[in-house]
């Protein structure tokens, strides 16, 4: 597979994997409100795996388009560029908070988990409002 097809495939896969990550995150949040810990645990595993795949694809995506990010210094950050940069920052916050959750928080209903959930909701809302 040549480089352009690989980039296209990676970019294309980001959409369904993001939807899966978001859906499993919402289900995880809902399961955390209940008393069935097994259900929460299953959703936590599913969400972690979907989000790990999303993170890997995101890293490949950013690496593939690194020249665009570097070009922001000279071209400036206006219009759609500003929206894409802010979206990148929001996704980075979601990834960092998710990694912190996996590494340092045990169980449901943590304050960091709630912030991670809010960041995810904001990411979906912002994506929906700014990108075509």
Model region roles, listed by residue range:
Residues 1-129:
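Membrane-embedded alpha-helical bundles that constitute the cytochrome b-like, heme-associated redox core
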């Amino acid at each position: 597979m040549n480089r352009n097809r690989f980039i296209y495939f990676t970019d294309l896969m980001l959409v369904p994997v993001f939807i899966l990550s978001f859906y499993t995150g919402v289900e995880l949040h809902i399961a955390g409100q209940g008393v069935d810990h097994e259900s929460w645990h299953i959703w936590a595993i599913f969400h972690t795996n979907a989000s790990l795949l999303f993170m890997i694809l995101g890293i490949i995506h950013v690496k593939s388009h690194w020249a665009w990010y570097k070009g922001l210094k000279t071209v400036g950050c206006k219009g759609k560029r500003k929206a894409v940069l802010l979206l990148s920052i929001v996704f980075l916050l979601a990834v960092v908070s998710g990694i912190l959750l996996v590494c340092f928080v045990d169980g449901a209903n943590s304050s960091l988990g709630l912030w991670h959930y809010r960041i995810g909701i904001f990411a979906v809302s912002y994506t929906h409002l700014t990108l075509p």
